[in-house]
Amino acid sequence: LQTVVRETGIDIDDLRAPLDDEERSRIEQEGDCVIVLVDIPSLDEKDRYVTIPLGIYMTKQAIVTVCLEETPVLKAFMNNRVREFYTFKKTRFVFQILYRNATSYLRYLRIIDRKSEQIEEKLHISQKNKELIELLELEKSLVYFTTSLRSNETVLEKLLRTEKVKKYPEDDELL
């Protein structure tokens, strides 16, 4: 982190924010840096669906991302699986990250839906506590996802209203 602070001038406390798994989604301006914090879906060590923070920092010379773990949202960019992304078009790049994030939520929601249906079928047959507990875990995940998606929506709306970030005509297709 010290190298990133030295190279970009981003405050160390701002860089550490997404390393706190309780950090909330928001957008802030700190000097010349626009900070976008959003929640992304993830699986925890017990294979439960949770959300974790992703920090995106836009400075004049760079875009920096910070997350508690390696994420498929960013991996797609690193592996050149996203067409027409350019880091010099910073706002568009952020919109593409947010779009990928929304796609990840949809993928996880489809998985949760399938698992819920399977558990419900088992529950009709067995009527055991194990299936009820599994169903409750999935319900909890849905609450996390719903809360995070609402927060992410607020961040996106604020980002669209922010005049400090340059927007491109082709951004409309992502939105």
Language-model features and meaning:
Residues 1-174:
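Peripheral, non-transmembrane regulatory/ligand-interaction domains of membrane transport proteins
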